[in-house]
From Swiss-Prot:
Gene Ontology BP, a term: proteolysis
Family label: Belongs to the peptidase S9C family.
Name the record gives this protein: Dipeptidyl-peptidase 4
Predominant location category: membrane
Record lineage: Eukaryota, Metamonada, Diplomonadida, Hexamitidae, Giardiinae
Domain of life: Eukaryota
PANTHER family reported for this sequence: DIPEPTIDYL-PEPTIDASE 5, SERINE PEPTIDASE S9 FAMILY MEMBER
Top enzyme category: hydrolase
Coiled-coil segments: none
Subcellular localization: Membrane
Function text: May be involved in metabolism of dipeptides or may affect host defense mechanisms.
MF terms in GO: aminopeptidase activity; serine-type endopeptidase activity
Length: 761
């Protein structure tokens, strides 16, 4: 038995530590919504059946959560005053509340297996199906007046087939059935994408945004609202584009104005989304649709493009309360997914005065556009909320900051930004206007996602600086937990350790600091030596953030008796624009320098004398795996590697990857531009070019459904190592994508990784 194996056995025997089995059993909060005063909260969470990949999405109701006291009774189900709602429904999501209608709305699987719209009457405690559409719908959003809804659906757009435009929902139902019944499975493509992330996209298949009226009809004996094809309309007819954009955009891609008349939505037209990031915001006027007699699908609505003047990405549209201004998050760089998103404001009151027939009708320049956060906020804008009742001129923003996602207040009058939170990662803000309170989701390295309340009435002032020594370490508003979903599932765990974090001065950039997290091995024993794991994140423009992970969770590695060093090297987001963009064209130079510096420094910590200098393994996924493939040929004192879904050949990947724009920004231009310097940069950072220098054992992991980095990269790397006599193993997932997301597959992943680490460390 090796020393490392003995340490692991002792570690597991001494105390109950987090295991992969524990992690996949956790309840995963997926959505929530509250009524106006938060006296009722509906939420859904998913938990997986033991030994399967089948997850159940359950709907719960919490009464008066703001009046509860924390901590909770350990004998309850870790939900305050909670009760299960409509347990017969499965696949629940897209939770909405209409103040006007005093009703909740959501999507769930209907009797025919499609996802349909339901309403929940909280007084009668009944759920009622209200949409009867031929295909599934998702990304539900209810208008402020409660008289209409928005939803998305997968349809087909054939330019020469009028039925696909005139009756898109019924046509899509029939077309999916026709394709399924064909005796062959082949397709012919003329447009990009052919596939995206892990999805095979059919020719001419698009995700379109629809509006439907919420109205009661005298055609039926009951008093139920019904959504049908007769009162639904495609808001982007003939568009060869998606809304929400694939693969991860959601209902934040569109919004109503405060009166429910105008809708702003994000899409990209022209089948160029694989090579360009020109996602723009269109606005349409629903008035004719709301006034028309049924059927309404023949109504032609006016469309104007508010931001087609900007050739970069625009996201998250939101109207001012008076409807005069459109706020949105926007990038400046074309063909970029990692530019900072800045908050912009644009007058759209005269948008429909533009008289033109072009689909792109609208402003042709950015004249009159206000760049609100440019020059005053060196972070990328995430979700933002404009309180309609605020006496202050404030906008509340979620943004990545110092490896967290924090809440900020932006004062439009003074152009100042105040950080309000610091601990953990926030998401899914919901503003309760009468209470000056936010609800939000929150997680950290020590706690899976729960629902929290953010009380703005106790906020104090703090303005952040770039100097990490001045970084605020405490929240400036009161944060209270409203749920503790996994108390029972984690109660046997002795401790989830709070990681140490430290900054080191950058060797290449004066006045910059490089941040690292460190997780100590669980159950440390005096006089024992423990191996070290170098944890390398993907992106490269993303950080190791203080949030819970169901996949690459450093707590699981530390629980096995390994120290874990996770460095946020140059390129990591949340540390400012200059720091983030420095990785472009420098894929391994600055990151390797930062990682090596943190690695060397960790041994100078007097309290870490237990760390081995000889037993060190490096592991990473995506860009982190690409980094592993390069590092193995350039660093000779790493014992072993784990590389998950990484690029082996940058030249091939430039034309294989689904998002063709990605290497354009990262590596200085498109591979086929015939720029000699550009091609040399692709070759400079090409791991395949240095394969003859690889020597350390390498565990290669790849998913067949990974369309970001094709499976051939993993197979090629594995075969190259084998042919060179280097110890290696290929772990192949036929059903997984860029991520291993199914619980049983994840357990197998962890078994293989732990076996590899235990063998070589």
């Amino acid at each position: 038995m090796t020393l490392s194996a003995w340490i692991i056995l002792v570690t597991l025997a001494m105390a109950s530590v987090l295991t992969p089995e524990d992690n996949v059993r956790l309840r995963r909060l997926t959505a929530y919504v509250a009524n106006a005063d938060a006296s009722i909260v509906l939420l859904t969470y998913t938990e997986y059946e033991e030994g399967t990949n089948h997850g159940n999405s359950m709907l719960w109701r919490i009464n008066d959560p703001l009046e509860a006291e924390y901590p909770f009774d350990p004998d309850d189900i870790s939900l305050l005053n909670a009760e299960r709602v409509c347990p017969e429904l499965v696949g629940v999501g897209d939770l909405q509340y209409s103040t006007h209608n005093q009703a909740f709305y959501f999507t769930a699987q209907g009797p025919d297996g499609t996802s349909q719209v339901y309403s929940y009457n909280h007084k009668l405690e009944t759920c009622t199906q209200i949409s009867f559409l031929p295909i599934s719908v998702s990304n539900l959003k209810v208008s402020p007046k409660g008289n209409s809804v928005l939803f998305s659906a997968e349809i087909f757009v054939y330019p020469n087939n009028h039925a696909s435009v005139d009756d898109p929902l019924n046509f899509a139902h029939d077309e999916f059935a026709r394709i399924q019944a064909r005796p062959y499975k082949a397709f012919a493509y003329e447009q990009l994408y052919t596939r995206h992330w892990d999805e095979d996209i059919l020719p001419s298949q698009y995700r379109h945004l629809f509006a439907a009226r919420l109205e009661r009809s005298s055609e039926y004996d009951d008093d139920y609202v019904r959504i049908t094809v007769d009162n639904s309309i495609d808001l982007m007819p003939r568009f060869d584009g998606d809304c929400p954009m694939r693969p991860f955009a959601d209902a934040s891609s569109y919004t109503f104005d405060s009166h429910g008349r105008y809708v702003a939505f994000v899409t990209q037209v022209g089948s160029t989304a694989a090579f360009y990031t020109n996602d723009s915001i269109w606005i349409t006027d629903l008035q004719q649709f709301l006034d028309a007699k049924k059927p309404v699908r023949d109504v032609v609505l006016p469309l104007r493009c508010a931001t087609c003047w900007n050739k970069a990405r625009d996201q998250r549209p939101a109207f001012s309360y008076d409807g005069i201004f459109l706020y949105y998050a926007s990038m400046d760089e074309e063909q970029s997914e990692s530019d900072l998103l800045r908050l912009r404001k644009q007058n759209v009151s005269d948008l429909f005065e533009y008289d033109c027939d072009s689909l792109f009708c609208g402003p042709v320049t950015g004249e009159g556009v206000f760049n609100l956060t440019a020059g005053v906020f060196d972070r990328s804008i995430g979700q933002f909320i404009i309180p309609t009742d605020s006496t202050e001129d404030s906008i509340y923003i979620l943004a990545e900051d110092h490896a967290r996602t924090n809440l900020f207040r932006y004062n439009e009058e003074s152009s100042t930004v105040t950080r309000l939170t610091y601990n953990g990662t926030l998401g899914s803000l919901l503003y309760l206007r009468h209470n000056k309170i936010f609800l939000a989701t929150m997680s950290s390295y020590t706690r899976p996602t729960d629902l929290v309340m953010l009380d703005l009435t106790v906020a104090t002032e703090f303005t952040a600086t770039r100097d990490p020594s001045d970084t605020m370490k405490d929240d400036l508003i009161k944060i209270s937990y409203l749920t503790d979903l996994n108390r029972q599932r984690l109660r046997h765990i002795d401790e989830l350790q709070e990681p140490e974090e430290f900054y080191l001065p950058s060797k290449s950039f004066p006045d910059q600091y490089v941040h690292s997290w460190y997780f100590a091995p669980a159950n440390l024993r005096d006089s024992h030596e423990y191996p070290l794991i170098l944890y390398v994140h993907g992106g490269p423009e993303s950080p190791w953030a203080n949030s819970w992970s169901y996949r690459w969770n450093p707590q699981l590695i530390a629980a096995r008796g390994y120290g874990v060093l996770a460095t946020n090297f140059h390129g990591s987001s949340s540390f400012g624009e200059v720091f983030q963009k420095s990785v472009r064209g420098n894929w391994y130079s600055y990151p390797l320098e930062d990682i090596m510096d943190a690695w060397s420094n960790i041994y100078t910590h007097a309290d870490k004398a237990y760390l081995s200098r000889e037993k060190v393994c490096a592991m990473g996924a995506s860009f982190g795996a690409t980094f592993m493939n390069y590092m193995n040929s350039h660093v000779n004192n790493v014992t072993c590697y784990v590389t998950h879904d990484g690029v082996f050949d940058t030249m091939c990947n430039a034309l294989e990857t689904d998002e063709l724009f990605f290497p354009v920004r990262e590596l200085g231009g498109f591979l086929l531009d015939e720029q000699v310097d550009n091609q040399q940069l692709y070759e400079k950072w090409n791991p395949a070019r240095f394969v003859e220098n690889m020597s350390a054992p390498m565990l290669v992991i790849h998913g067949q459904k990974d369309y970001r980095i094709q499976v051939y990269h993993g197979i090629s790397l594995f075969q190259a190592l084998r042919l060179r006599g280097i110890k290696t193993k290929l772990v192949y997932f036929p059903t997984q994508s860029h991520w291993v997301w199914q619980p049983q597959e994840s357990l197998f992943w962890h078994t293989q990784v732990f076996d590899w680490l235990d063998t070589y460390l």
